[in-house]
Amino acid sequence: MKFSSVLKQSAKYAAHVPKSGVFPRGFQVGSIASGVKKNGNLDLGVLVNTNKSYESSAASVFTTNKFKAAPVILSQRVLEEKNGKGINAIVVNSGCANSVTGEVGLQDATQMAKLIDEKLGATSPSTLIMSTGVIGQRLQMDKISKGVSQLFANNSFGSDFNSWLNIAKSICTTDTFPKLITSNFTLKNGTQYTLTGMAKGAGMICPNMATLLGFIVTDLPIESKALSKMLKFATDRSFNCISVDGDMSTNDTINMIANGAVKTDEITEDSPEFLQVRDQVTQFAQKLAQLVVRDGEGATKFVTVKVQNSSTFADAKIIAESISNSMLVKTALYGKDANWGRILCAIGYAKLDNLDSLQTDKLNVSFVATDNSEPRELKLLVNGVPQLNIDEERASQILALPDLEVLVDLGTGNEEAQFWTCDLSHEYVTINGDYRS
């Protein structure tokens, strides 16, 4: 199954792709089919900050995979050298990951960024790089260079809806729909601002950054250290709380740029608006991350795993992750099998920081319907005791829903965490069995 047909035929496209939007001031985006992708789809995108009245701030969260791709290594260097200030562009390609490509890969990534810097007249490196696609293949820099030249020569940049939608399309690989969201927010002091985000990912998705590329931009002025803290907090509760298949990629990157086009006081960690913006960014990032799971390769279900009343947030998250990554749980969900023993097993082998977080005689596990049908909650385990007379018909009804929740109550504290995952189907094997072709 080829991506070109997947994108056109996807029923998810109509359900999750916006038809309009308002975008942050002071940004322009462009995209082009450079030829890196064999199918002729858009595969090169550039985002540019055009606001010169404020020195932009940038922050990133990168993969923890030991085999970091060249664009990850180079972007980390640029951010460190610039202390998160003066980053004015992001260039991204799909079709080739430029990963495990050695010194020549770093040279290609450097050249890719330099192409943009030169077009913008930058006197020092100010471009972040992102790549996604097949690992171990060298980037076709002749095509990238020609594509960049055409983008700028034809002035193929815009701030309209179609321009933003097309750059979201340009980063897709096995995705069945481009992931683009934009929202307006109002601070308590009356300041209005906008967040726009896009992401790609449908497979090789597992926390601590998987095959997941994304960026969020805003027209708020945010100090670089405050922005970094916001993004880390948001990522820990969004992009690091999703799982499709448990595989961690070499390229994951989430970038965020604040260009200060909104005329208001710069937000720092000490600003009264800091927590409000941080929480708004977190909720926004969660919506964007959830789209990745909804587009999980071959997925038929979107599943929220909620772990509540834990002694710590960390342990609640560890348990939610363990359940979300379990292949046996995911296949049971696909088969509509109310096999709660698999959930219990995944809870039991979770590598907790604090063993007191899990006490078997306080544990409760339920399936929860999300369509407002009753009974909404079907209890499977109560205070460690299995419910022997489970309504199997009701269980089948809940498990047949496209959206459902697995609820775990530890009864040992007041902290909670959520993970978002999907089922594992035959189609996942089909997609990944011929990915390179």
UniProtKB/Swiss-Prot annotation:
Disulfide bonds: none annotated. GO terms for biological process: L-arginine biosynthetic process; ornithine biosynthetic process. It comes from the Eukaryota. The active site is at T211 (nucleophile). Substrate binds at T173, K200, T211, E297, N432, S437. Pfam families: ArgJ (PF01960). The keyword Isomerase does not apply. The record marks A210, T211 as: Cleavage. GO terms for molecular function: glutamate N-acetyltransferase activity; L-glutamate N-acetyltransferase activity. Keywords: Acyltransferase, Amino-acid biosynthesis, Arginine biosynthesis, Autocatalytic cleavage, Mitochondrion, Multifunctional enzyme, Transferase. It is found in: Mitochondrion matrix. GO terms for cellular component: mitochondrial matrix. Its EC number is 2.3.1.35, 2.3.1.1. The alpha and beta chains are autoproteolytically processed from a single precursor protein within the mitochondrion. It catalyses: N(2)-acetyl-L-ornithine + L-glutamate = N-acetyl-L-glutamate + L-ornithine; L-glutamate + acetyl-CoA = N-acetyl-L-glutamate + CoA + H(+). The keyword Transferase applies. The record marks T132, G133 as: Involved in the stabilization of negative charge on the oxyanion by the formation of the oxyanion hole. NCBIfam families: ArgJ, PRK05388.1. Belongs to the ArgJ family. Catalyzes two activities which are involved in the cyclic version of arginine biosynthesis: the synthesis of acetylglutamate from glutamate and acetyl-CoA, and of ornithine by transacetylation between acetylornithine and glutamate. This protein may be expected to contain an N-terminal transit peptide but none has been predicted. Heterodimer of an alpha and a beta chain. This is Arginine biosynthesis bifunctional protein ArgJ, mitochondrial. It comes from Zygosaccharomyces rouxii (strain ATCC 2623 / CBS 732 / NBRC 1130 / NCYC 568 / NRRL Y-229). The lineage of its organism: Eukaryota, Fungi, Dikarya, Ascomycota, Saccharomycotina.
